[in-house]
């Protein structure tokens, strides 16, 4: 006689069932339900994490736009001292009236002229180089 069981093979394999078998213990059913709830929570967490990641990417794009805008504002503010200096120089050279012709006229500053600035970086570098040479001599 062989050492194998004479029972049919199908009784040795577990049969998957969609409905819970009648003989399962309540503790096992509670654990299965707990794991199902945990799976649902993990799926919700995954979806929420994906939403947060998308919002962070949008925030990154907005911050890069803000950063480039800040650089532009810094450039404009860095040039204001030149504008104010030009206005101050023009205001300092207000001509004194030679004759008291009209008492109601207000002396105006010198006329300011617009100069194209396409070569401004090269001119500024040249002016800074000349300033450094003069300070090196002194």
Curated annotation (Swiss-Prot):
Cellular-component GO terms for this entry: cytoplasm; DASH complex; kinetochore; microtubule; mitotic spindle; mitotic spindle midzone; mitotic spindle pole body
GO biological process per UniProt: attachment of mitotic spindle microtubules to kinetochore; attachment of spindle microtubules to kinetochore; cell division; mitotic sister chromatid biorientation; protein transport along microtubule to mitotic spindle pole body
Record's keyword annotation contains Chloroplast: no
Claim: Heme is one of the keywords in the record: no
Keywords: Cell cycle, Cell division, Centromere, Chromosome, Chromosome partition, Cytoplasm, Cytoskeleton, Kinetochore, Microtubule, Mitosis, Nucleus
Subunit composition and interactions: Component of the DASH complex consisting of ASK1, DAD1, DAD2, DAD3, DAD4, DAM1, DUO1, HSK3, SPC19 and SPC34, with a stoichiometry of one copy of each subunit per complex. Multiple DASH complexes oligomerize to form a ring that encircles spindle microtubules and organizes the rod-like NDC80 complexes of the outer kinetochore. DASH complex oligomerization strengthens microtubule attachments. On cytoplasmic microtubules, DASH complexes appear to form patches instead of rings.
Protein name as it appears in the record: DASH complex subunit DAD2
Organism: Chaetomium thermophilum (strain DSM 1495 / CBS 144.50 / IMI 039719)
């Amino acid at each position: 006689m062989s050492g194998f069981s004479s029972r049919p093979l199908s009784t040795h394999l577990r049969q998957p069932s969609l409905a819970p078998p009648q003989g399962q213990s309540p503790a096992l059913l509670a654990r299965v339900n707990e794991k199902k709830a945990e799976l649902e929570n993990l799926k919700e967490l995954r979806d929420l994490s994906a939403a947060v990641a998308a919002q962070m990417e949008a925030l990154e794009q907005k911050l890069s736009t803000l950063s480039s805008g800040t650089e532009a504002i810094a450039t404009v503010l860095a040039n204001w001292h030149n504008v104010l200096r030009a206005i101050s120089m023009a205001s300092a050279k207000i001509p004194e009236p030679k004759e008291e012709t009209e008492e109601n006229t207000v002396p105006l500053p010198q006329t300011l002229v617009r100069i194209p600035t396409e070569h401004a970086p090269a001119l500024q570098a040249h002016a800074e180089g000349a300033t450094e040479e003069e300070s090196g001599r002194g």
